[in-house]
């Protein structure tokens, strides 16, 4: 309960469950840590040359789902649990919200395009999230989304109507890329 006082100061009349308070304390700890890093970079004259990239790889699964839904005030569909926010920050950066589907494979091309706008990143499986090309995300269960529609492997469809053939072509391409990733991760480059 190191940060309980800060949570109580922010929410003086809170009647949150202990799990929610514990989660909030972890967020305070993260915020404090980022602040310390920024202060140190600023003191060393390096803050202007730093890009912060923050990406949670999951929703707060350590929380009871019903409790989490009560806290955020909405009921979440299973597919929505996979939606996460990528935060990128640099000094002087103009704030912008970009709502496009993406996954971890899209982070490197996005960062590289911010640093080098040539857009020549053919060796990456992902794509620049700030680009104009429509992006699709393949999940570990091989379901696919373009942010508007969601196709599961049993061909259950959620969201807006779409061209099934086009989705199947993208699905095949994404699965092929996934196979390449597996080969890369499972190979011993230095042995061969």
Language-model features: locations:
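Solvent-exposed soluble domains appended to multi-pass membrane proteins
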Residues: 1-192
């Amino acid at each position: 309960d190191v940060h309980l006082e800060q949570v109580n100061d922010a929410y003086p009349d809170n009647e949150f469950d202990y799990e929610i308070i514990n989660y909030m304390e972890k967020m305070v700890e993260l915020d404090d840590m980022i602040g310390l890093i920024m202060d140190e970079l600023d003191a060393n004259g390096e803050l202007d040359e730093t890009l912060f990239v923050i990406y949670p790889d999951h929703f707060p699964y350590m929380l009871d789902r019903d409790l989490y839904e009560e806290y955020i005030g909405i009921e979440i569909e299973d597919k929505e649990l996979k939606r996460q926010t990528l935060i990128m920050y640099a000094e002087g950066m103009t704030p912008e919200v970009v709502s496009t589907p993406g996954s971890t494979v899209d982070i490197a091309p996005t960062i590289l395009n911010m640093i080098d706008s040539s857009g020549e990143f053919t060796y990456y499986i992902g794509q620049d999230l700030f680009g104009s090309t429509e992006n699709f995300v393949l999940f570990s269960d091989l379901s696919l989304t373009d942010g508007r529609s969601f196709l599961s492997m049993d061909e259950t469809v959620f969201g807006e109507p779409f061209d099934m053939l086009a989705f199947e072509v993208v699905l095949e391409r994404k699965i092929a890329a996934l196979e390449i990733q597996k080969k890369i991760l499972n190979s011993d480059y230095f042995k061969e």
